[in-house]
Amino acid sequence: LAPMRRAIAAAMARSKREIPHYYLQTRIDMRAALAWLQAENQRRSLTERLLPAVVLLKATARALRDVPSLNGHWIDGSLHVAEQVHLGFAIALKGGGLLAPAVHDVDTKSCGALMAELHDLIPRARAGRLRSSEMTDATLTVTNLGDLGVESVFGVIYPPQVAIVGFGRILDQPWAEQGMVGVRPVVTASLAADHRATDGHIGARFLDALSRHLQHPEQL
């Protein structure tokens, strides 16, 4: 195996061996978020336009502020909740393998600043030019496979983190509200979390907070 593949194999085997995962998922109406993105991008130049991934990252960070026990590390038999929200952003490498460098202080940055940071981070990750802090500081990882057509993804927690959030493709789906059925753009959000650190009701609160923040993208 290539060195990166060996490192991934060791980390994932350790995760499944040591971490009792629990899994939750929910469907989230993205109509408000996509409408806000469209309006926002009309005011921006082509190089400054925002992608849905940025809104999903920012909403995840805000939800972690609401439910902080998913934001941290399991070390020496106890949960250490992090003071900052540094989200690992999973990036597939062109030669194979995966990295999830940290985007720092996601909850305090604007969507525009986050988009600029991703434009810088992704090519550096693929060129092998990441800083050590970007490789070690993540407090939770986000994986998004929507651009590959996947509808949902359940990730494997990267130790010592205690959760990973996954997003699938945004799809038009039937949606019932107030007795009426229509079609909405919907994303499936999933959570894999460490049962030593939290229980299912904490995970459910997080997914509910995530959905609420995505209904009010102008506040992100």
Predicted regions and their residues:
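C-terminal catalytic/motor cores of large multi-domain enzyme assemblies
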Residues: 1-220
